[in-house]
């Protein structure tokens, strides 16, 4: 899944497709490709060109092809089923190569469909779920000789989500489009018809677009677009006019990238988890790079990271030790390589880096490998140095993150590290299959819980920000998982608002930090329901008694906290081990809101860079 683009009209298609794919590069991807309709009559066929790596590589290859094709489809892929490779890249084709498709989404019953199709003589070339669609359409086309009808028929067999565009060499100039739970936009410009998964790919051609709804289909031709429902009945589309410029389109209509990326976090959770658990309840991490026997031998774990990634590591420590019972240490990468840590062949070093190119983290990886450790990477960038130099890797599927302050990548890291902790616990037989399946389901539910926070807590966040905006300093506190999130909350506030903030485990208050508190001093606490809730409340009462303005991230329905809090930001009730995923979102929103009130640039804070590539 990642980006879809299609064009049919009078202009040269390859140029339009490449431009559209480039517009969507910010979404992240590992490969790209196009299918172009070439020739006429009996000589008509499809040229399919695919590349691993950047769209620039695809563009270079296309520049060497003298093609006047005026109809085609393109795609950027981020692997979900099957590793990044040319054979797994889109577009995928039917057995005879006369139908090509691009697809975003997940086909949940693809294994069953593939087995049935192979039993009927179809030959699969890739490991992807998407290829199932090409063969289903091929079968239907043999009966209907109508591409749109064949796409509609194929969709009746599929369980899952799809944004789909298909072309057929026997129907020149036609693109058939379908949508269910995966975005698709359609537009008509002066020289033809367009389809994409993101309006940004169409912004140069047209400002009037139709956002397909679930169960709707579109047939694109150079003359225009026909819209139908699942039964093939014509429907009247709802046309939306966009006044966005390119900058606004890239931001998805949000005022800044930071807010856009905060709002993308439900999708990040879903994308990072998709396809990760088999129906039998076993975790499936194709990119593992380590055998189950090697994992079972692991007796010590180091999580090495910097900045926000370090805080994700603190959460991982609790999970790995709690579930797998493996001693785990979290280290700043800049310190790890200089202190001669104890490393043996049964040590696992987990390197966490959003960019995959953090200099200190890379140096620590190399040092650990020399000493014989197994190395596992958590990163957001396919093919990055961290990915290349690790034995295995989990990609966070956050897509490109533009704001300097990491938000969605952090959530992706926490979810990925949670998967690793679950896997280690299963390998060590510390969790049963039933327990792992239950925890995985609850982890998946955090996507909806984040969405609830985004939908309901805007006013509370603004009220909390008003209590902080004129402060000189702020204190974040929490216990257990709440402490780990407090460290991240303090960093976010410092990064984007330039307000000095520190975080402490709440139990350390009386050992120094309480000396900071005077009337009006903001104290931000993570006090969700947990085994240490009462003790955290007691610490907050001490702050309140000294005049602090107490802002609390608290569980929905908790009335007790009302007695001491000046402002409450609510989060849904979750198992304590998953509270970092939900409780971090209000702190991200708070940091951004304080920064906005203080007139700061939230996307590009002063003195900071997105990735630190020097030591």
What are these regions (language model features)?
Residues 1-251, 255, 267-299, 338, ...:
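Conserved short alpha-helical segments that host acidic/polar catalytic motifs at enzyme active sites
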Residues 7-10, 103, 123, 140-144, ...:
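Hydrophobic alpha-helical scaffolding
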Residues 70, 74-87, 279-293, 316-352, ...:
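Glycine-rich oxoanion-binding loops at beta->alpha junctions
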Residues 156, 265-269, 273-302, 392-522, ...:
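Active-site phosphate/pyrophosphate-binding segments
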Residues 296-438, 442-445, 526-571, 590:
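Glycine-rich phosphate-binding loops that contact phosphosugars or nucleotide phosphates
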Residues 232, 549, 562-564, 570, ...:
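Generic C-terminus detector
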């Amino acid at each position: 899944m990642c980006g879809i683009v299609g064009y049919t009209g009078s202009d040269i298609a390859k140029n339009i497709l490449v431009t559209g794919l480039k517009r969507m590069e910010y979404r992240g991807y590992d490969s790209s490709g196009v299918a172009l309709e070439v020739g006429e009559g009996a000589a008509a066929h499809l040229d399919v060109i695919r590349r691993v790596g950047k769209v620039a590589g695809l563009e270079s290859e296309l520049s060497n092809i003298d093609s006047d094709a005026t109809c085609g489809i393109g795609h950027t892929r981020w692997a979900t089923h099957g590793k990044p490779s040319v054979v797994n890249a889109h577009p995928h084709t039917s057995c005879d190569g006369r139908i090509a498709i691009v697809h975003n989404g997940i086909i949940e019953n693809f294994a069953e469909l593939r087995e049935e199709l192979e039993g009927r003589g179809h030959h699969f070339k890739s490991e992807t779920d998407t290829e199932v669609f090409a063969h289903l359409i091929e079968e239907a086309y043999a009966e209907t000789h109508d591409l749109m009808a064949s796409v509609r028929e194929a969709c009746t067999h599929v369980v899952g989500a799809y944004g789909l565009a298909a072309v057929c060499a026997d129907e020149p100039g036609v693109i058939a489009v379908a949508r269910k739970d995966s975005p698709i936009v359609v537009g008509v410009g002066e020289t033809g018809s367009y389809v994409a998964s993101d309006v940004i790919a169409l912004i140069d051609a047209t400002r009037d677009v139709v956002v397909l709804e679930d169960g709707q289909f579109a047939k694109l031709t150079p003359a225009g677009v026909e819209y139908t429902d699942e039964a093939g009945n014509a429907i009247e589309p709802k046309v939306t006019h966009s006044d966005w410029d390119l900058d606004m389109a890239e931001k998805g209509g949000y005022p800044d990238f930071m807010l856009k990326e905060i709002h993308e976090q439900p999708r990040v959770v879903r994308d990072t988890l998709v396809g990760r658990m088999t129906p039998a309840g076993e975790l499936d991490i194709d990119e593992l790079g380590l055998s189950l026997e090697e994992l079972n031998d692991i007796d010590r774990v180091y999580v090495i990271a910097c900045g926000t990634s370090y805080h994700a590591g603190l959460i991982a420590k609790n999970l790995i030790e709690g579930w797998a019972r493996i001693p785990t240490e979290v280290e700043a990468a800049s310190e790890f390589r200089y202190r001669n840590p104890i490393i043996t062949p049964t040590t696992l070093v987990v390197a966490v880096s959003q960019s995959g190119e953090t200099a200190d983290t890379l140096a620590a990886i190399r040092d650990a490998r020399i000493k014989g450790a197994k190395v596992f990477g958590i990163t957001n960038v396919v093919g990055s140095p961290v990915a290349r130099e690790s034995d295995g890797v989990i990609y966070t599927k956050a897509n490109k993150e533009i704001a300097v302050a990491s938000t969605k990548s952090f959530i992706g890291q926490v979810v990925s590290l949670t998967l690793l902790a679950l896997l280690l616990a299963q390998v060590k037989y510390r969790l049963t299959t039933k327990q792992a399946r239950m925890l995985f389901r609850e982890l998946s539910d955090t996507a909806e819980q984040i969405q609830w926070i985004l939908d309901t807590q805007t006013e509370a966040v603004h009220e909390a920000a008003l209590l902080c905006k004129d402060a000189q300093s702020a204190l974040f506190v929490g216990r257990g998982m709440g402490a780990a999130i407090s460290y991240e909350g303090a960093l976010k506030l410092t990064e984007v608002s330039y307000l000095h903030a520190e975080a402490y485990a709440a139990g350390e208050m009386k050992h120094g930090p309480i000396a900071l508190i005077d009337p009006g001093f903001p104290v931000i606490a993570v006090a969700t329901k947990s085994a240490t809730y009462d003790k955290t409340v007691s610490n907050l009462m001490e702050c309140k008694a000294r005049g602090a303005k107490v802002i609390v991230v608290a569980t929905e329905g908790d009335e007790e906290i009302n007695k001491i809090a000046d402002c409450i930001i609510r989060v849904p009730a979750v198992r304590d081990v998953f509270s970092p995923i939900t409780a971090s979102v209000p702190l991200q929103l708070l940091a951004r809101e304080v920064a906005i009130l203080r007139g700061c640039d939230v996307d590009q804070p002063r003195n900071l860079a997105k990735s630190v590539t020097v030591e």
